[in-house]
Amino acid sequence: MLRVRDDLPPFLKNYLPDGHRNGRPFVTLTYAQSIDAKIAKQRGVRTTISHIETKEMTHYLRYFHDGILIGSGTVLADDPGLNCKWIGPNNDPDESMEEKSPRPIILDPKLKWKYSGSKMEELCNQGMGKPPIVITTKTPKVKEANVEYMIMEPDANDRISWKSILDTLRRNYDMKSVMIEGGSHVINQLLMCSDLIDSLIVTIGSIYLGSEGVTVSPPDEVKLKDISWWKGTSDVVMCSRLQN
């Protein structure tokens, strides 16, 4: 089980889900980037950016969310577990990792990812995580065991509306909070959705990844407000909200 530095919980407190919401879920957009705004050395390459302190912070954040969403590119590149390893606020040995973990949500319109044989399946089978929801635009020919498929209608640009995704997660799965971790296409789209994002939490690692890296750069200007900074051993973390 992981612990977090004592100064992180008070720093993050005002940016966590408040638990008193009607309508769409509380949404936290969070990711780690290099100094040159890259989230990976190359597309499809798993890349270490942040210090162990901020990796532990990620698990702390997961504890406070009902769901955790990533895109198909990230799940294919990283094979993540998407569970929560934080020890919890009460250090309760009877609280299982499965209970503490958010529900994984995979945005996979073309059904490129397979749950079978994944790290997620392994953790779920061990009682250390939850089975995923896969958001897609078509009914799979063969449905994988323990996977729930959320079939969504794409728009004229062959994209799924983020508002529709969040509304459906709340209505059909009672998700009051969702943490979104990437990848770049997901992040760049959501940075333009100030009406849907409640908190933005960005870790900046002490590394440059170079010109071939995968860049976070939304298509237009994005202004932030309510900004706070935290300094760790080798990373800094920025918490903020998007201006309307």
From Swiss-Prot:
A Pfam family reported for this protein in Swiss-Prot or TrEMBL: RibD_C
EC number: 1.1.1.302
GO biological process: riboflavin biosynthetic process
Taxonomy, superkingdom: Eukaryota
Pathway: Cofactor biosynthesis; riboflavin biosynthesis
NADP keyword on record: yes
UniProt-recorded Gene Ontology molecular function terms: 5-amino-6-(5-phosphoribosylamino)uracil reductase activity; NADP binding; oxidoreductase activity, acting on the CH-OH group of donors, NAD or NADP as acceptor; protein dimerization activity
Enzyme kind, highest EC tier: oxidoreductase
Record: residues binding NADP(+): T74, D78, I160, G183, S184, H185, V186, I187
Keywords: NADP, Oxidoreductase, Riboflavin biosynthesis
Catalysed transformations (reactions): 2,5-diamino-6-(1-D-ribitylamino)pyrimidin-4(3H)-one 5'-phosphate + NADP(+) = 2,5-diamino-6-(1-D-ribosylamino)pyrimidin-4(3H)-one 5'-phosphate + NADPH + H(+); 2,5-diamino-6-(1-D-ribitylamino)pyrimidin-4(3H)-one 5'-phosphate + NAD(+) = 2,5-diamino-6-(1-D-ribosylamino)pyrimidin-4(3H)-one 5'-phosphate + NADH + H(+)
Leftover remarks: Using chirally deuterated NADPH, the enzyme was shown to be A-type reductase catalyzing the transfer of deuterium from the 4(R) position of NADPH to the 1' (S) position of the substrate.
Function, as annotated: Catalyzes an early step in riboflavin biosynthesis, the NADPH-dependent reduction of the ribose side chain of 2,5-diamino-6-ribosylamino-4(3H)-pyrimidinone 5'-phosphate, yielding 2,5-diamino-6-ribitylamino-4(3H)-pyrimidinone 5'-phosphate.
Similarity annotation: Belongs to the HTP reductase family.
PANTHER family referenced in this protein's UniProt entry, alphabetically: 2,5-DIAMINO-6-RIBOSYLAMINO-4(3H)-PYRIMIDINONE 5'-PHOSPHATE REDUCTASE, DIHYDROFOLATE REDUCTASE FAMILY PROTEIN (AFU_ORTHOLOGUE AFUA_8G06820)
The protein's assembly and partners: Homodimer.
Protein name, entry field: 2,5-diamino-6-ribosylamino-4(3H)-pyrimidinone 5'-phosphate reductase
Organism the protein comes from: Candida glabrata (strain ATCC 2001 / BCRC 20586 / JCM 3761 / NBRC 0622 / NRRL Y-65 / CBS 138) (Yeast)
